[in-house]
Amino acid sequence: GAMVGGLCGGGADGGVWEPVLEAALGDAPIGAREPELRQMLSLTEAALADPEYTFEPMLPDAGELLADRVQALADWCDAFVLAYAAAARDAEREQMSDEAGELLEDLTAIAGGLDPSGMGEDEDDEEDYMQILEFVRIAALNLYAERHPGADAVLH
């Protein structure tokens, strides 16, 4: 989430948002993983800019417990919002569209409002998760498109 938020908020220059990514990675500093992270950064930015909208958040797959996937999605949204805020300059945030501001508010609410303990393993809970995941995916694509005018806008 931190890498995608940084890309959506300001681009591939990670100087401002790398500390958020380091925090998300835990104990290992970026330097130890820089080649892999640079490759992942390039692939992620290509997916965000792809006119076929191939971007997918990196989250646990369907074989994992739903509660674990819900927690991972909440953590992804939290890291996204933190990195976006770190990457976007204050003046640029003031010029943000109302829709972009609402999307960031929604992602913040998802980060703080998803309760994995309230999720069972039934089809309704799985469907709810998939709908939230798709919203997050489209929100990231829209936020990227707003900050990168050459990218296609998804909008809704």
Model-derived features: positions:
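Domain-length accessory/inserted modules outside core catalytic folds
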Residues: A2-C77, V81-H156
